[in-house]
UniProtKB/Swiss-Prot annotation:
Region feature Disordered, mapped onto this chain: 254-301
SUPFAM superfamilies named in the record: Cystatin/monellin
Name this protein carries in UniProt: Alpha-2-HS-glycoprotein
PTM section of the record: Phosphorylated by FAM20C in the extracellular medium.
Gene: AHSG
Annotated function: Promotes endocytosis, possesses opsonic properties and influences the mineral phase of bone. Shows affinity for calcium and barium ions.
Organism from which the protein derives: Pan troglodytes (Chimpanzee)
GO molecular function: cysteine-type endopeptidase inhibitor activity; endopeptidase inhibitor activity
Assembly mode: Alpha-2-HS glycoprotein derives from this precursor, when the connecting peptide is cleaved off. The two chains A and B are held together by a single disulfide bond.
Phosphothreonine carried by residues: 319
A UniProt-annotated Pfam family: Cystatin
């Protein structure tokens, strides 16, 4: 009898250690197109667009999988996998992502893949973990829909850099306001016929007057940040190059005093990195955040890549590297995949094929 009691105690002890701390033993798998699942996915999309410092906003394309874990003493943890698509709105553009156009296949679309964990507490979602990567569509797939469409070019290609600088000079020459400096080359394509370079880039306003500025080095960025987004084409002609440029200047952004991590205000170069290089470490010391930290405090952002090497787009993996946020449910990295008990959503008996709950619908197109 004593042996039986001891065996039962050991079994209970093993069960306690095998479950993730702070999470229940049973998870549920709602439908990927349920309103609650989509709400969680849209919070994840907002998180990407609010924290990705370079390139373009992303929009939700498909929800691949979702698991919901009960969390002790309250709340639920949503583990969700989503596919995203790049839009034509830059991350500095204040336009809501719902009003941004998705970049089409013939324009050389970019797809993102993300794993998120979101804590739902008192009806509100907050991100506690984010890991993403993104990549342009293959050249073969672009050629299938448009044989002559140009592909993405490396952002530091000499022709691209020359086109961006020439376009900025042309914009400043016809601008009666502040002188603008080049902030980031965001996207570029080399067009074979007619020979031309298409480039998109961002600019930032300075305290110099455009018509009077002679040395950019003597100009300082405005205290209230003012950014603009430009599209330009530099065409090669017999008589020389011809530049066509249009810029949209966004409203100034007031300075807000917020606590910053150590080294956050240091000047960093325009991020263009080698895709084969290892990812930069995240800001702050590696390791797990302390328990009891504010749920809206995050340490997910990576240090900006600093090497100007061949790179055609700003990969999400350099920003969302899978570091646990300070708002993690237990203050540590959770691993809910260890527990395999699952509760499927109830489905009544009905004639016809059973539709799997996941993956969900494709909102735009598959890359």
């Amino acid at each position: 009898m004593k042996s039986l009691v001891l065996l039962l105690c050991l079994a209970q002890l093993w069960g306690c250690h095998s479950a993730p701390r702070g999470l229940g033993l049973i998870y549920r798998q709602p439908n990927c197109d349920d309103p609650e699942t989509e709400e969680a996915a849209l919070v994840a999309i907002d998180y990407i667009n609010q924290n990705h410092p370079w390139g373009y906003k992303h929009t939700l394309n498909q929800i691949d999988e979702v698991k919901v874990w009960p969390r002790q003493p309250s709340g639920e943890l949503f583990e969700i996998e989503i596919d995203t698509l790049e839009t034509t709105c830059h991350v500095l553009d204040p336009t809501p992502v719902a009003r941004c156009s998705v970049r089409q296949l013939k324009e050389h679309a970019v797809e993102g893949d993300c794993d998120f964990q979101l804590l739902k507490l008192d009806g509100k979602f907050s991100v506690v973990y984010a890991k993403c990567d993104s990549s342009p569509d293959s050249a073969e797939d672009v050629r299938k829909v448009c044989q002559d469409c140009p592909l993405l070019a490396p952002l530091n290609d000499t022709r691209v850099v020359h086109a961006a600088k020439a376009a900025l000079a042309a914009f400043n020459a016809q601008n009666n306001g502040s002188n603008f400096q080049l902030e980031e080359i965001s996207r570029a394509q080399l067009v074979p016929l007619p020979p031309s370079t298409y480039v998109e880039f961002t600019v930032s306003g300075t305290d110099c007057v455009a018509k009077e500025a002679t040395e950019a080095a003597k100009c300082n960025l405005l205290a209230e940040k003012q950014y603009g987004f430009c599209k330009a084409t530099l065409s090669e002609k017999l008589g020389g190059a011809e530049v066509a440029v249009t810029c949209t200047v966004f409203q100034t952004q007031p300075v807000t005093s917020q606590p910053q991590p150590e080294g956050a205000n240091e000047t960093v170069p325009t991020p263009v990195v080698d895709p084969d290089a290892p990812p930069s470490p995240p800001l702050g010391a590696p390791g797990l955040p302390p328990a009891g930290s504010p749920p809206d405090s995050h340490v997910l952002l990576a240090a900006p890549p600093g090497h100007q090497l061949h790179w055609a787009h700003y990969d999400l993996r350099h920003t969302f590297m899978g570091v646990v946020s300070l708002g993690s449910p237990s203050g540590e990295a959770s691993h809910p995949r260890k527990t395999r008990t699952v509760v499927q959503p109830s489905v009544g008996a009905a004639a016809g094929p059973v539709v799997p709950p996941c993956p969900g619908r494709i909102r735009h197109f598959k890359v």
